[in-house]
């Protein structure tokens, strides 16, 4: 099979042959990328909006959600996102999917997490890279497109409900509330954050109850809000 890339000059290493006596060109010609099942890659973007300024307590913050028009999680609300094209960088995937599903374009996006539990999608093994963005609501217009049945700004709050401590782990539970009166969206999600103490801080966000928010997107939103709150505190 021909090489995936036209220019392979930066992959020669020392230029020696491998154990089978193959050059890089010969190795790539014989390589079968379909020998093993490959995971699919997607992006999901948490877009926050504010009016004039971002408050320290994130009061008045909104999140952009789309209503799914197809399976899985049909009828539920989700983050704008979708599958990466074969020759597309992930940052470009995030921007493209955001524009296709909501009409929002031209705003900076930042990669902040990866969600890869094997059972997060019934279609296939899907690993998603999470992005976040922040914009003044008056600077963007939202319009549902592609496979989104609807798109809307929803007020969003995140409060800590419970906390447990052990010598090795810290566990917190958050209540995420998402509302939009016009769309009759009033949902509550419960998300658990488990973090290992020490220099290597293994961290896991898990949805206990997602309400009408699709898949693990409530956990992604909570993680993004935590990060945004930290950034605001640093600036202010």
Question: Where are these predicted regions, by residue range?
Answer:
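N-terminal leader/linker segments that precede catalytic domains of diphosphate-processing enzymes
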Residues: 1-236
